[in-house]
Amino acid sequence: MREAPHVLGIVLAGGEGKRLYPLTADRAKPAVPFGGGYRLIDFVLSNLVNARFLRICVLTQYKSHSLDRHISQNWRLSGLAGEYITPVPAQQRLGPRWYTGSADAIYQSMNLIYDEDPDYIVIFGADHVYRMDPEQMVQQHIESGAGATVAGIRVPRAEASAFGCIDSDDSGRIRGFIEKPADPPGTPDDPEQTFVSMGNYIFTTKVLIDAIRADAEDDDSDHDMGGDIIPRLVADGMAAVYDFNDNEVPGATERDHGYWRDVGTLDAFYDAHMDLVSVHPVFNLYNKRWPIRGGAENLAPAKFVNGGSAQESVVGAGSIISAASVRNSVLSSNVVIDDGAIVEGSVIMPGARIGRGAVVRHAILDKNVVVGPGEMVGVDLDKDRERFSISAGGVVAVGKGVWI
């Protein structure tokens, strides 16, 4: 039997997430709650763990306390078997400076690579919502002989200009890696589609080390994985694309096969939540064969009393809905909605309370927000604009701990 390759997982989780403000005012983007019982980082960690990649370093920097705590409490593996998921804050090993980019984060954390001495390194982002079996991508990387493999998702060519785009040949070799081009390239088999980078990479270890070292010595570099490292390897003919559409996840439905969302804006974050709530959801949280992990809390079940109801909604553990109406919404844990309140098309994060007769529509309420009796959010946007953040799509976002 062929020995399994030695793989180290590195998750880039230092992002500030300015476009998600106010949700990122007090936490790193990967720590933002999602889906009623998770945090954004749980999706990438679940994909790696489900694929049995069990040596994982999570590189953190910006306001990382809640992220570090979440990983430590909810992602404990067996140290006796050499398995670990460990948060690694920026440590200034190479001098008194923080990470200046994702490639610099790898450069300043090279000791992790030397200590583990892997054959291959999986470097994934921490802030996307999706299911993926990364082992299939690693196998293609090994078989192709590439030094680097970039996961690409197919999007309509007319929509690809907002992303980093991949130009590849019939063999999968990448000929060009172009950031937000005016005229995106088609895929080899369909000129109306474009491969867009998902921010997920596989590297042969020596190739990565050499590229990171060369980049560190380049004063003109922004020290970014997608902007500098991958183009460097493309120029050397060492990069290949992995078609995400070929990834087969156990238990996936026809509807959520190939689902991937960048939730970097308030509108995208909101829309991804709305993908969860229908009877046959666009993204199915309930796939037991490829579970999303990390959301376990020792809480009582949700409770509905005095005729309270929730339709086409996800309701987290410990929540209580009393004589209130919830529709097309996602409620996290320990949310309380009092008599006569109405919640429609909204995302409510842990510990929020919505008072008697209050109305919340088309809104995101962060943790521990209190909406007083009779108050309204998302009903009068002119009034809300004076108090809260409002997205381009009209989603009202209320920051953590605000009393209304």
Swiss-Prot record:
Pathway: Glycan biosynthesis; glycogen biosynthesis. Its EC number is 2.7.7.27. Keywords: ATP-binding, Carbohydrate metabolism, Glycogen biosynthesis, Glycogen metabolism, Nucleotide-binding, Nucleotidyltransferase, Transferase. It catalyses: alpha-D-glucose 1-phosphate + ATP + H(+) = ADP-alpha-D-glucose + diphosphate. CDD domains: ADP_Glucose_PP, LbH_G1P_AT_C. Alpha-D-glucose 1-phosphate binds at residues 99, 164, 179-180, 197. HAMAP family: GlgC. Involved in the biosynthesis of ADP-glucose, a building block, required in the biosynthesis of maltose-1-phosphate (M1P) and in the elongation reactions to produce linear alpha-1,4-glucans. Catalyzes the reaction between ATP and alpha-D-glucose 1-phosphate (G1P) to produce pyrophosphate and ADP-Glc. Belongs to the bacterial/plant glucose-1-phosphate adenylyltransferase family. This is Glucose-1-phosphate adenylyltransferase. It comes from Mycolicibacterium vanbaalenii (strain DSM 7251 / JCM 13017 / BCRC 16820 / KCTC 9966 / NRRL B-24157 / PYR-1).
